[in-house]
Amino acid sequence: MAGMSQRPPSMYWCVGPEESAVCPERAMETLNGAGDTGGKPSTRGGDPAARSRRTEGIRAAYRRGDRGGARDLLEEACDQCASQLEKGQLLSIPAAYGDLEMVRYLLSKRLVELPTEPTDDNPAVVAAYFGHTAVVQELLESLPGPCSPQRLLNWMLALACQRGHLGVVKLLVLTHGADPESYAVRKNEFPVIVRLPLYAAIKSGNEDIAIFLLRHGAYFCSYILLDSPDPSKHLLRKYFIEASPLPSSYPGKTALRVKWSHLRLPWVDLDWLIDISCQITELDLSANCLATLPSVIPWGLINLRKLNLSDNHLGELPGVQSSDEIICSRLLEIDISSNKLSHLPPGFLHLSKLQKLTASKNCLEKLFEEENATNWIGLRKLQELDISDNKLTELPALFLHSFKSLNSLNVSRNNLKVFPDPWACPLKCCKASRNALECLPDKMAVFWKNHLKDVDFSENALKEVPLGLFQLDALMFLRLQGNQLAALPPQEKWTCRQLKTLDLSRNQLGKNEDGLKTKRIAFFTTRGRQRSGTEAASVLEFPAFLSESLEVLCLNDNHLDTVPPSVCLLKSLSELYLGNNPGLRELPPELGQLGNLWQLDTEDLTISNVPAEIQKEGPKAMLSYLRAQLRKAEKCKLMKMIIVGPPRQGKSTLLEILQTGRAPQVVHGEATIRTTKWELQRPAGSRAKVESVEFNVWDIGGPASMATVNQCFFTDKALYVVVWNLALGEEAVANLQFWLLNIEAKAPNAVVLVVGTHLDLIEAKFRVERIATLRAYVLALCRSPSGSRATGFPDITFKHLHEISCKSLEGQEGLRQLIFHVTCSMKDVGSTIGCQRLAGRLIPRSYLSLQEAVLAEQQRRSRDDDVQYLTDRQLEQLVEQTPDNDIKDYEDLQSAISFLIETGTLLHFPDTSHGLRNLYFLDPIWLSECLQRIFNIKGSRSVAKNGVIRAEDLRMLLVGTGFTQQTEEQYFQFLAKFEIALPVANDSYLLPHLLPSKPGLDTHGMRHPTANTIQRVFKMSFVPVGFWQRFIARMLISLAEMDLQLFENKKNTKSRNRKVTIYSFTGNQRNRCSTFRVKRNQTIYWQEGLLVTFDGGYLSVESSDVNWKKKKSGGMKIVCQSEVRDFSAMAFITDHVNSLIDQWFPALTATESDGTPLMEQYVPCPVCETAWAQHTDPSEKSEDVQYFDMEDCVLTAIERDFISCPRHPDLPVPLQELVPELFMTDFPARLFLENSKLEHSEDEGSVLGQGGSGTVIYRARYQGQPVAVKRFHIKKFKNFANVPADTMLRHLRATDAMKNFSEFRQEASMLHALQHPCIVALIGISIHPLCFALELAPLSSLNTVLSENARDSSFIPLGHMLTQKIAYQIASGLAYLHKKNIIFCDLKSDNILVWSLDVKEHINIKLSDYGISRQSFHEGALGVEGTPGYQAPEIRPRIVYDEKVDMFSYGMVLYELLSGQRPALGHHQLQIAKKLSKGIRPVLGQPEEVQFRRLQALMMECWDTKPEKRPLALSVVSQMKDPTFATFMYELCCGKQTAFFSSQGQEYTVVFWDGKEESRNYTVVNTEKGLMEVQRMCCPGMKVSCQLQVQRSLWTATEDQKIYIYTLKGMCPLNTPQQALDTPAVVTCFLAVPVIKKNSYLVLAGLADGLVAVFPVVRGTPKDSCSYLCSHTANRSKFSIADEDARQNPYPVKAMEVVNSGSEVWYSNGPGLLVIDCASLEICRRLEPYMAPSMVTSVVCSSEGRGEEVVWCLDDKANSLVMYHSTTYQLCARYFCGVPSPLRDMFPVRPLDTEPPAASHTANPKVPEGDSIADVSIMYSEELGTQILIHQESLTDYCSMSSYSSSPPRQAARSPSSLPSSPASSSSVPFSTDCEDSDMLHTPGAASDRSEHDLTPMDGETFSQHLQAVKILAVRDLIWVPRRGGDVIVIGLEKDSGAQRGRVIAVLKARELTPHGVLVDAAVVAKDTVVCTFENENTEWCLAVWRGWGAREFDIFYQSYEELGRLEACTRKRR
């Protein structure tokens, strides 16, 4: 402060209000009087008084507003100033008055320099003081470059903050880097708090500046909080708290998120938040300087969800005296990391909902203080715990074991010596690196087997690891580096099949026992290495299953001396680290097998068996070398040469000359193809490394008609020799075009030599010149004018041209040299051994052996006259039989096949997704002969009429070829692939070769040019091979469909007099859909053209050889004539042309290297054209007719509807007629939107999402209804109007516009054609603006909905019912599309829009976005790629695929529905595609975790790599109509057990007991989690007969007539029983009956001798007294049943049930039921549902529709279900359960008597109460099987159950009344007219049922046993009856016209359970889950878990697809 005392603070720092409004005058006075400036008086400028007068004059001028005068005075003053100091003082005057111009003048012209000391009169300081931002900017920019005057900047900043100049503050901080946290100080001064920018801003009340500073690096300090408490609080409350509405339980309140982080707050004042404490949901106080907190944080914040206290100085949190003070029970996340806590606050243990706790980087020595933690519940919901970077030495099990939901634990960087014992929780991630762990617990696999994925125990002191670590089934990442491991557990016991990364680096692997390195170590052996002595070899081996999953393996820094052999089998490895193993000197050749390995670390290794130069090239080269060694690769010099060219050009002669060196004597016949071998020796003087090259020569000839067939012999990596006749000159050059285009189309990038023959026919004297000319012509064909390669043609340069004379043999030697030289330079791209030259390439020995085997097979078949093709299975067998075969995987087999194709050994066409790809042709000659049959057909009417042949006639041509019915599909695919026969309908094919080259009659006579004609010309640089054939086939399909539409409309429409009606044609790949439809008069088509005439016009398409711009070209011309000027036919044709090019010939959409498009469209002006038609001289046409470029039309169409022609500007041409496809004139008028009724804005708030290709989807309203508008934006370029006509920019914009119009048209057409409830409907279209309106999805996309719902649950985030419905609706939409031959191609959750999440709604989703959908046109689809991860593996460039690609994507969408996650397999498209093709799929979880067994199985079926194995959408739809699909959750195998018991109440656990005495054990299964929580826990004792859990007690009865009572506490095992009771007989069943008194109940134990023991229990403890009820005594004394009556036999009590609201207990007594009155504990009534020898086995009480109780019972002999009304004891219904197909059975329910009968004390055995089941007869005969005859009023009176005769009687017995009264009545089952079909539909796969019963040889008795009901379960308001065969009958009670009836509403049967034996028991757990247990002959048990659906759920399920069916039908009718 010393510096301050010498001079008073400047006026700037007077922060009080009275001095703050300082004017420039006062400021200037102060500036002048502020003391000596330190400058000497100027010698020239006069005295200081004069200077003062000058400055005063300047100021006065500024004050008057006379800036001009002030500037003159300033300039004058400058002239008189000598020093910079004086000039600086002058500069401060205009700076003070904000005169920017004068400031610039002084700085630039007068070179005034700005001083950098922050004095009061510094111009920058003055400008900052007065807030002149522009002046400040100018002044600071005048400073020299490197200068950074920080003191000046800080002074100006503090000043501007105090004065309130936000603009200056922003400029200083953001542009010039002033530090908001620095004090403003001058030289030799100390900082003062008032000069801190934030302090100054707050003190002077400049709130906006204070906030700006706080957001840009300023912080609160204690002075600010003390001196300005209220402003500070105001700032914190106003700017650092965000609001959002609170949940509905707090109406009107807003939730507050307090974000006070990174403010360096020294404390938090209670006053800041006490009044809002109940609204705070998020409190972030991280990165402050807090050492204490107010007591309200966090314990008193009742709504707090998230708390972040990280990065402070907290030693503890506020204490609490009792748990009552902790009211923040809703807390979900706490972050308290980077503090100074020594233990976690005990209050945390009361936060029962806490999910995430981060406490890393503290000083924790204990987790919690045990002595302070009292009556805590524990963090049962905690999912993530991070306590890394602390000082913990142990983790107490006491606390950890309460973390029941923990899935992530991080205890890295502590001092743990022991890892805690595992406990029951779903732990997924465990990190414990950098501790002092010496051992690990061995029970990890018990609790975490199916959960733990990521484990890190690196950098510890582990000497061994337990086997359990490698038995974690879900384990993906295991890091054990930096330990002391010398061995791993034996690999044969590992089960970690999903392990991806294993890091074992920096261990002791390979060291022997003494710890010394030895030459031969005990740790590893390699194959073939023998060991001496008896030493047991301990080998590091990895299990075989890791080859599918392990990707990264680190073995570096160990003591290995060999690479473990099993490492070489890990074929998925991508990274392998072997460095720093000093003993490792060799790499095994087997490493070469690892095809995916890209990182091989051999750092510091001396590898002796790989040459050094190869090691330098890196891992790829090393692996290639090892692979070649391993596979005994040999150099191969065999290649394929294909000689082609027009007929009779001298091909065969040329070949003979090359082979023999002389001209042939015999002329060869016209064979289509000849094959021969030729070896070419190295010419003298060649430097090539190979001695010779061997060719498999295919000489392809034959008549010109066979030219299309010959393309099928063109393959990659072959040398093509195109032969032509020089003597024919230019004509022959033109003919070369066909061959060159063909070669490039079928074998892109092939090497082609063009050889001219007949050289001797050119005169010698003109020869050189003539040859040069002809060569130029050939090159002009293949190269563009700029010299670059022409698109569509092979890469031919002058080096590839040669001439030869076959007579004089001139040029033959040169040709040999050329062939040898070219061959030696050909590369083998994509080889398994690495890129190498083709000649002399290394080929695995096994490939060569396979080649020999294939050739031998081909010769054998030739001898036997057998078919010359192999199926894929036959080829695989051939591979397997080849000696020393090492071809193991699919990719290697493909490489071998490629080699066979490249060498001419095989022909194979892998570019279809299935079918043709499964055939391998051995002999091209044979194949050619087969195809020749087709070409031998003449266009006779008998077989092929108009070039179209019926499929059966085409099949007839197969007879005798060897193609069978099984391979006919492949044959047809082959014909279509090479355009030999193209499908034009389901049963007919077009044979293009039969079409005439010109129309058969004069078409010009039919065409009269009139004013009603428009034309379109397509100019193409080349016409691709197959273009016309495919175009005509598509046209024929479309025209046929058009006729069909007309025919249907005639039938359907009553009166429609329009000539052009709506025609929905979804054409081609791009699914364009023109509405053009006419009635054809004549259709004429030929090889390159088609003409259709109709009333009032015609349309024609033909090839045109137009020669515009004197450039080679072909193309097509379209003419459309219409008297009514409806030119929609033009749109119809152009749609087809564009789509065909898009899908099959995309090369045409490219440009030449000089930028000219390969294809251009022109539109001749119709006005000029009509005028020209009047002329007679055709030569004038080109000059007189204007050709509009399509680009001009498109660009004009964006702005207006007319285009002007330069030849008649006064007569504009309407674009709607010229380019009808752009204006959608072929669409019905009703589809065009009225723009006046469309309300939409394109601001950001209205954007719903981005479509493909830059389209944007907006929220809008049309006619008052919300809609989604998809807008196609055409790019705008700056100054586009000024762009010259012919520029690249114009072309780019036109291309973009064309693309937009094209995609708009395609998608709108597609949507218009589709009408289905699960597909988004088109509302209308608009051209200006270019958009269409769709239905608006209220809830956005499925992806968004899933991501919002997936946070809370691990699987099925939308719940099972909604998930089922959504999956069903997607499948239904797909089935509809596939029925329409449309392949969606881009199905994913983003393209599925959600309408409703209410399961009761009929429609929940709709499919959208058909941007890349394709129509398959009977030929499959080609091209388009969907979204990586969803896209099927077979979609690759140039591969033809079918609708099964959508089923693959559907599988991925199912994955999303089940997991809530996207199917992520990587970030790069190539990486994802590779993984998918290898069969790698996203990991979901075990079925018992996911709990939607059928949907998961369907998902896996859909994403099968082979398309033919995927289901059809239609079959998926029918599968999902079975309720089993939705209700079956999972099965769980439980091993050998002896008894099963379930829990009562809300618990999800079931218990198995096994063994007896010392080996007795129990297993606890949690059915909710699908998890065995306790596995075979030992609990010695006698065999358990019965068990009951009541509250916290478990009662178990054993076979030694004892009851043991155990107390249940947490996870504690059952050790010693709390109490033991004796009983007179073995207990067979228990029942707990609550009593009115609190905490007391009765336990009834039914005994084997018929007694019932009653134990009163108070507070969990049974009283000493126990009473017995004797059934025998009651029967005799009360019900007068004699002792000799069969009903008095000692029957065990099998079932007991509490009835009549707990006032009675009904229990079984043989065939009868006895009723106990709970009040008096006496038997008061007997009921007789059955007759002896039947025994009641199950009793259950449920409520019926009116809410009254009914009791159901079941017996073991008659197998019938009896229903009693509980209050009247009246028998109401009986149903026989032994019906094989009970679905939709009904039985009457007797109405109640008005008065209940008096209590019956007698029981007559002859006439039991109610309807007796006395008349049941069971008969068995050979013919009829088992028959059960029941004489009662049931609709299931007669059932024959023989293996095959069950159905007919069943159907006969069914009367119409057995069907539901209405299709959608409550809990009804939909039905079809055909009962049998309908049964098939609802019985879980009727076919599978049939197979289970009918196809197994089963005697009648076994069959009837399978139909025996096992138990009755009351599930919600339904009765479920499981039967021994494994199916479950579901029965509901329903009203029907006043009366009640029972009906079987479903039969559930899971075929998956068949192998598990018979159903033995069942139970309902937690009221909503049904568990059935199955036992097989080995006493192995399996649990089947079902969703316990009630009537409501079944109702929703059935209605969902009934309603969808109804809506589909309505849509069809509407159309």
From Swiss-Prot:
Effect listed in the UniProt record for changing T1075E: Phosphomimetic mutant which abolishes phosphorylation of RAB7A and blocks activation by phorbol ester. Increases phosphorylation of RAB7A by 2-6 fold
Cross-referenced InterPro entries: Ankyrin_rpt (IPR002110), Ankyrin_rpt-contain_sf (IPR036770), COR-A (IPR032171), Kinase-like_dom_sf (IPR011009), Leu-rich_rpt (IPR001611), Leu-rich_rpt_typical-subtyp (IPR003591), LRR_dom_sf (IPR032675), P-loop_NTPase (IPR027417)
Residue span(s) of domain Protein kinase: 1242-1525
Superkingdom of this protein's organism: Eukaryota
Phosphoserine modification, residue list: S1064, S1074
Alphabetized UniProt keyword annotations: ANK repeat, ATP-binding, Cell membrane, Cytoplasm, Disease variant, GTP-binding, Kinase, Leucine-rich repeat, Magnesium, Manganese, Membrane, Metal-binding, Nucleotide-binding, Phosphoprotein, Repeat, Serine/threonine-protein kinase, Transferase, WD repeat
Outcome when changing K1270M: Abolishes phosphorylation of RAB7A
Stretch list, region WD40 loop: 1791-1907
GO MF: ATP binding; GTP binding; identical protein binding; metal ion binding; protein serine kinase activity; protein serine/threonine kinase activity
GO cellular component: cytosol; mitochondrion; plasma membrane
Record-listed GDP binding positions: P647, R648, G650, K651, S652, T653, G669, E670, H758, D760, C806, K807
Domain COR: 844-1036
Effect seen on changing S1074E: Phosphomimetic mutant which increases phosphorylation of RAB7A by 2 fold when activated by phorbol ester. Phosphomimetic mutant which increases phosphorylation of RAB7A by 2 fold
Biased composition range(s): Low complexity: 1841-1872
Protein name: Leucine-rich repeat serine/threonine-protein kinase 1
Species the sequence originates in: Homo sapiens
Lineage, top ranks: Eukaryota, Metazoa, Chordata, Craniata, Vertebrata
Gene: LRRK1
